[in-house]
């Protein structure tokens, strides 16, 4: 058998590239604005809540000056906790903090992709969650364009 012929893969059109760049540019612009409004507090993107189970642990890890913008936190809290331990090696701790551990354990792609950023420290882990979001916006825009 000889080599298999493959059809050439067309490069994305200029309009697709422009759309993706606009979407990613807008996302990065919003990240920059938020980072300027809350300098040194990337946890703002996580949206910890004052009445949640996550906040006391987050204050232990990230410091007492943790920015807590809401009464009730958002899903970012759970993703932050999962990104700290994506293999659930310390599952007993997570089970005491998670609002719904079985539900959260089914949603592992995002925190697993963000987890390596934690090699740069806790702040790196927080920025990793943001970076993965921006990358997802880029991919989603590409496939939708």
Region locations from a protein language model:
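Aromatic- and Gly/Pro-rich amphipathic surface segment
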Residues: 50-70, 78
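Transmembrane-helix motifs of polytopic, lipid-linked glycan transferases
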Residues: 114-119, 128-145
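Membrane-embedded alpha-helical segments of multi-pass membrane proteins
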Residues: 49-53, 109, 131-139
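Charged, low-complexity, helix-prone segments enriched in Lys/Glu/Asp/Gln
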Residues: 24-31, 90, 125-129
């Amino acid at each position: 058998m000889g080599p298999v012929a493959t059809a050439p893969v067309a490069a994305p059109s200029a309009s697709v590239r422009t759309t993706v760049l606009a979407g990613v540019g807008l996302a990065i612009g919003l990240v920059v604005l938020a980072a300027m409004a809350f300098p040194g507090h990337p946890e703002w993107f996580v949206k910890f809540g004052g009445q949640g189970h996550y906040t006391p642990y987050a204050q232990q890890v990230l410091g007492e000056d943790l920015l807590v913008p809401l009464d009730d936190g958002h899903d970012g809290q759970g993703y932050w906790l999962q990104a700290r331990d994506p293999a659930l090696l310390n599952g007993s701790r997570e089970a005491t903090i998670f609002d719904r551990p079985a539900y959260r354990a089914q949603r592992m792609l995002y925190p697993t992709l963000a987890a390596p950023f934690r090699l740069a420290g806790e702040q790196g882990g927080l920025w990793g969650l943001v970076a993965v979001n921006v990358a997802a916006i880029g991919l989603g825009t590409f496939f939708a364009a």
